[in-house]
Design a protein with these regions (language model features):
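Active-site catalytic motif of lipid deacylating hydrolases and related acyltransferases
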Residues: 1-40
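Gly/Ala-rich beta-loop-alpha elbow adjacent to hydrolase catalytic centers
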Residues: 45-50, 54
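The alpha/beta-hydrolase serine catalytic core
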Residues: 64-184
Length: 184
């Protein structure tokens, strides 16, 4: 994604921070980065657990979201990974505590409110998460179902322009607040 945006001269539009282990700290970090950017348009993109966070942010703030093989019930899926875990990118490790699962539960979105705000990219060959849960959780969302594939969406370059086109869609912004009126 970063490489494609650089090719298009749009690198300044991209931010992909290293996320803290705490889900609540992750949400706070994302919100602070958006506030600091002071941009009128925001689309959050999240893969796996990042898709869960993106869904929370989309519902809380009305932002459009692109979800790449998103986790739907991560507190269930991650309960078997309590304790020290290796970091898959960059080396090192992190410690997953039981309270992290509680934080995830608190961020859950039972159902999305405006499916047109979402673009789901799900791979039927995801070896980590069940794509059918993803499809069921995002009814009505724009969806690309990759036949086969994997959790990392290793062939993402085939979909990056579709993702960018969705991000550039003008009518995904939250509706303007309506003026309250007195009904007689």
């Amino acid at each position: 994604m970063a490489a494609r945006l650089a090719e298009l001269g749009r690198s300044a539009e991209w931010c992909c921070p290293m996320l803290p282990v705490s889900p609540l700290e992750t949400i706070a970090l994302a919100e602070s980065l958006v506030a600091a950017a002071a941009t009128p348009r925001v689309t959050v993109i999240g893969s796996s657990l990042g898709g869960y966070f993106a869904t929370h942010l989309a519902e809380k703030h009305g932002w459009p979201a692109v979800l790449l093989n998103p986790a739907v019930v991560p507190q269930r899926d991650l309960s078997q990974y309590l304790g020290e875990q290796p970091l898959w990118h960059g080396g090192g490790s992190m410690v997953v505590e039981p309270y992290h699962l509680d934080e995830l539960r608190a961020l859950g979105v039972a159902s999305i409110t405006r499916p047109e705000r979402y673009y789901l990219v799900a791979a039927s060959g995801d070896e980590v998460l069940d794509y059918r849960e993803m499809l069921a959780h995002y009814p009505g969302a724009r969806t690309t179902l990759i036949e086969g594939g994997d959790h990392a969406i290793s062939d993402f370059e085939q979909y990056v322009d579709d993702v960018l086109a969705f991000c550039d869609t003008e009518d995904l912004e939250p509706p303007a607040p309506r003026a309250a009126g007195l009904i007689r």
